UniProtKB/Swiss-Prot annotation:
This is Thrombospondin-2. Residues 1-22 form the signal peptide. A motif (Cell attachment site) lies at residues 934-936. It comes from Gallus gallus (Chicken). The keyword Glycoprotein applies.
Amino acid sequence: MLQRSRLLWLAVFITLWVSSDAQDDAKEEENTFDLLQISNINRKTIGAKLFRGPDPAIPAYRFIRFDHIPPFKPEKLKKIVKLIRQNEGFILSATLRQDRQSRGTILALEGPGISERQFEIISNGRANTLDLIYWVDGFQNVISLEDVDLADSQWKNLTVQVTGENYNLYVGCDLIDSFILEEPFYEQLKAENSRMYVAKGSIRENHFRGLLQNIHLIFDTSIEDVLRKKGCQRSQSTEVNTINESTEILHLSPAVTTEYVGEKTEKKAEFCDRSCEELGTMFTELTGLRIVVNNLADNLQKVSEENQIMWELIGPNKTLKNQSVCWQDGRVFADSESWIVDSCTKCTCQDSKIVCHQITCPPVSCADPSFIEGECCPVCSHSDDSEEGWSPWSDWTKCSVTCGSGTQMRGRSCDVTRSACTGPHIQTRMCSFKKCDHRIRQDGGWSHWSPWSSCSVTCGVGNITRIRLCNSPIPQMGGKNCVGNGRETEKCEKAPCPVNGQWGPWSPWSACTVTCGGGIRERSRLCNSPEPQYGGKPCVGDTKQHDMCNKRDCPIDGCLSNPCFPGAECNSYPDGSWSCGPCPAGFLGNGTVCEDLDECIAVSDVCFKVNQVHRCVNTNPGFHCLPCPPRYKGSQPYGVGLEVAKTEKQVCEPENPCKDKTHSCHKSAECIYLGHFSDPMYKCECRTGYAGDGRICGEDSDLDGWPNNNLVCAANATYHCVKDNCPLLPNSGQEDFDKDGKGDACDEDDDNDGVEDDKDNCPLLFNPRQFDYDKDEVGDRCDNCPYVHNPAQIDTDNNGEGDSCAVDIDGDDIFNERDNCPYVYNTDQSDTDGDGVGDQCDNCPLMHNPDQTDADNDLVGDQCDNNEDIDEDGHQNNQDNCPYIPNANQADHDKDGKGDACDPDDDNDGIPDDRDNCRLRYNPEQEDSDGDGRGDICKDDFDDDNVPDIFDVCPENNAISETDFRKFQMVPLDPKGTAQIDPNWVIRHQGKELVQTANSDPGIAVGYDEFSSVDFSGTFYVNTDRDDDYAGFVFGYQSSSRFYVLMWKQVTQTYWEDKPTRAYGYSGVSLKVVNSTTGTGEHLRNALWHTGNTPGQVRTLWHDPKNIGWKDYTAYRWHLIHRPKTGLIKVLVYEGKQVMVDSGPIYDTTFAGGRLGLFVFSQEMVYFSDLKYECRDA
């Protein structure tokens, strides 16, 4: 029985222990909130990227799309706000790695309105503070903890305590800074129609930049317990001697009461303070106790048996036979009778057995109790002294604050061996110092303007003044002064002041009334400097003055016989002689005899010339110019004499409707001047973000040149006016195989055969049965070699038969095994160097090199590649048709071996280029029927490529007529790299759109057209949310070691291969010049990834200081301007209709032109759409 009792007590003890532990766990779970979990943030959340943090079992997140961050669940938010009010605050625990010197919101509560915020916690890396911002009665309050060192790109474990009056920050186990709150802002928090977020700021600049992990809100737990759970150890002595700035009371034994003068606080939750070792010792002691109890039970049983034997020996009293009585000390006691053996033992007779027990005394509450004779228990004498047992009070502690209201404490101890010590052991009182300076840094603000002052004059024009002061508010704590002037002055007008009249200057003397013999001359003046006004006095004096003139005697006049040429001045002398002055304007001679002057010959450039032909007409006398030629505008001067001819020359300017604003382009279109020789002289192109024929433009969301809605364009419109069949995905070719109105780019089943494109082995041909004989993942119905494995489907001669199964790949009627250029059409099979490779496809046609190696990918074999290029135009000297003049395009229209750039007669028609009205077409007759300066033979097609100039992307180069990347050279920049695969390019829109589908090593798809000055534009779009790396384009490509590249990174990242050099890639647009000494390989690969300069590899010309990365599923449009002659490079990037990136003018003359191409590095599903390049060599 005793054994069962012991086991029962042990089971009760274990049950209470486990139950207490479970309650603690439930309480912790109820009062601790995982903010990422209640926000439903996981790996599927858009814009949330998974990373590995310090705790490998829990994911860390970086947010790049803050508009997709979900708020807390409403029911959880209501509970959190309720707990904040109950606990008078909260504790925030988080593990984070914040980007260096960034400013980011960690936690924010916004609402009930759309733009209202109730409070937020912001880590300000620029100011190195942790800011608590809250709003009370519409006013913003900012409290900053300083020198926190959070935004340094290092992992930090922080604990933020906002409880009562405390605002404290712990990093790890260290208290960094603290502040006393003056307002209980948490009492005004509202959950209704509100939203709480992590990482999301009120504006774009306040979003959190970095990684977050293990972010929790904790309630009903002291800051000491939170830190203890994080492994922070605090010694007992330290805890006892620490006085908290809050009004919490130290927890002592329940036997001692505490008196507190200040505000009451709720009792904090207690936790088990026994270690596992202590509990083990307790079980050992319980086992020993069980042994002792068993021994006592055995001894008691022996005593009972001995008593029974004694009872039988003595025997009962004869008179008490058949009665239940008890014997003790010779006395007989009846059944149920009780008696006191001594003062502290009481016995009772029960069924002839004596049962005794000791009297239990209640505890006394005094130090000196007294005993009354005959009584077992001591008693206290009554005393009214409440100080009994207490030590004297200690001195008051220092005030808890240095300004404002605080508290002081004092204590005393109790001698518990002498007294129960009624009353408190700690007392608290208020203390007050000078008022705290709660000022914060604030910028100055202007007061209202004062009234205008009175006018500074009583008549006429004066000034009035008003002032304002920089005192609303006054700048303080380093705040900025007010911007602007504190004084304004304006004119004021009163009645005009009287103006007295003043004489003006005398006029010249008039001609004398006679030339000799005495005459009269006069002069006059006016009272107009100024005239008398507004009651002023008139001028005093005469208005006219007379004088005698020509008083000499009259001579004999020799000019009366008109001896001089008409118009020449005749001078007569007193002796009767005469002389003639110079010939009149327009004549040459001695004054007596004059001849006509031919101004057209004397001033050869007096009139406008067309093709060096003079358009001046000489008259007698004088000259005049013919009207400006057709499509020119300007003056038609005429006159007489050299002075007029020299000063009034004819200027004829080509008509330019774009400049004159006489064009008919849409307001959202750009007028592009084509030249006065073109008909029409201009064309209209819709601006970025719009599409149409230029006369009419509509919205174009995906920037692929097709409008969102149908446009009513002109009847002869040839450009995009039809509604975009994929309005949200760039597809400039508008391919629609099944004609269902939905473009192939966004149609999940292009051929309507019931098999989605990503699973269809013939996505553009109806084949529901999906037969594939050769297992090359190309269906038999669309396989150009159905019985030969050829997944690439290359068909060089475009005859429908793939190269893998064709006996004549290039279609030149020479079988492959006998064709020395199997992939190039060459019927003559010429092979000058006899290396077995035909001249048409030989990269060294004059030097034996059967292996055809080309290490630098410049289309010149290594055997004959000397890389000597004095003019830096990408063509080595012995292959350059102008070795000393840069001409990357190598244009040579008369095929004489001398490039146009250094050929004085490009068409070899005997007319020098500067006088040839068709510089690129043979026309020795120079016929020009309309006299506009452009020869008839090249009127609308200057380069004779059968493409009208208005549609020709290079109207002065017959080798290039349209944008076309259908044929390109694939250049792997890390050909031996094993980290990823090579790029995979898909061609669309007749080479005006390319899609790169693979997550690849760095590579270029470079076209074969070559350019000097060029404009290059295209639409950039990433059709996936996977990865965040580089894409862009190249220009001035001369080899895989020499080119310019514009590359765009989504997020900042260190390259995963840190050999041979460590590479840091920053988000944003970078413009780089590659001039590698090693060529393709891992050195160039890491240098391209790195944002900065790598000696001997890459030099960064410009990086966008805003570090804006591209976004998934967003269309961008780039525009490049490159002028190698001056070194000008300029790049614009549009997002929608707005310019997002503008490099401004950058100058670099490393390379004088080259080829264009597209670039990718570790980024898949990149769309390059609506590509367009135009020559700008003119």
